[in-house]
Amino acid sequence: MARLLQASCLLSLLLAGFLPQSRGQDKSKMDCHGGVSGTIYEYGALTIDGEEYIPFKQYIGKYVLFVNVASYUGLTGQYIELNALQEELAPFGLVLLGFPCNQFGKQEPGENSEILPSLKYVRPGGGFVPNFQLFEKGDVNGEKEQKFYTFLKNSCPPTSELLGTSDRLFWEPMKVHDIRWNFEKFLVGPDGIPVMRWHHRTTISNVKMDILSYMRRQAALGVKRK
């Protein structure tokens, strides 16, 4: 009996290594702060092949979804759903942007040149190719975090009160607004101002419903202005 209990505990620990356990304090979505100073259009990033710097101002008038991604995470399957989301909502002005990061459980260990082949042949595999732009691997938290992520995080409250298990988080210093895990999402409106932030466990179907609801509100406001 003792051995069975020990094995059960070990299994739980191993499974926990792939994805942080859910907490009662988690919220699926948070609305961003009003009166934010600046816009995302002040920033930009290098594409995953390092060949092009894309200024985010090229997305003026678009709804832009920022996602920090990883190839060896329990949530890597979200890539398939994100492709579907991009395809479905692109006609309405949605643009997805993916930012590989290795700060959560060391789940994006490869070089930039290895990430797309890994997605194609390993996880999700089956010839998968993202239909949205991926950028160079970089930090989203800590001393060397990318500046646009500083802007996004300062614009939106966190979706969880707790950061998680410190031995699986690889950055310093840790701050209350930090991203908690792979596949957190931020939506930026057509004016470049952050609108919503989603917990990494929030389903893509719920993210889609939230985005569509926001798009409808924006459309209604546009009609009223006319």
UniProtKB/Swiss-Prot annotation:
Enumerate the PROSITE patterns for this protein: GLUTATHIONE_PEROXID_1, GLUTATHIONE_PEROXID_2, GLUTATHIONE_PEROXID_3
Annotated CDD domains: GSH_Peroxidase
User: Which GO BP terms sit in this record?
Assistant: hydrogen peroxide catabolic process; response to oxidative stress
Q: Name one GO molecular function term.
A: identical protein binding
Class in the EC hierarchy, top level: oxidoreductase
UniProt keyword annotation of Oxidoreductase present:
yes
Q: What is the annotated tissue distribution of the protein whose record heads this document?
A: Expressed intensively in the kidney and adrenal gland, and weakly in the cerebellum, heart, and lung. Secreted in plasma.
Identify one Gene Ontology CC term for this UniProt entry. Answer: extracellular space
Q: Which UniProt keywords apply?
A: Oxidoreductase, Peroxidase, Secreted, Selenocysteine, Signal
Which reaction(s) does the protein catalyse, per the Swiss-Prot or TrEMBL entry? 2 glutathione + H2O2 = glutathione disulfide + 2 H2O; tert-butyl hydroperoxide + 2 glutathione = tert-butanol + glutathione disulfide + H2O
Catalytic site positions = U73
To which protein family does this belong?
Belongs to the glutathione peroxidase family.
Q: What does this protein do?
A: Protects cells and enzymes from oxidative damage, by catalyzing the reduction of hydrogen peroxide, lipid peroxides and organic hydroperoxide, by glutathione.
Name this protein carries in UniProt: Glutathione peroxidase 3
Q: Which gene encodes it?
A: GPX3
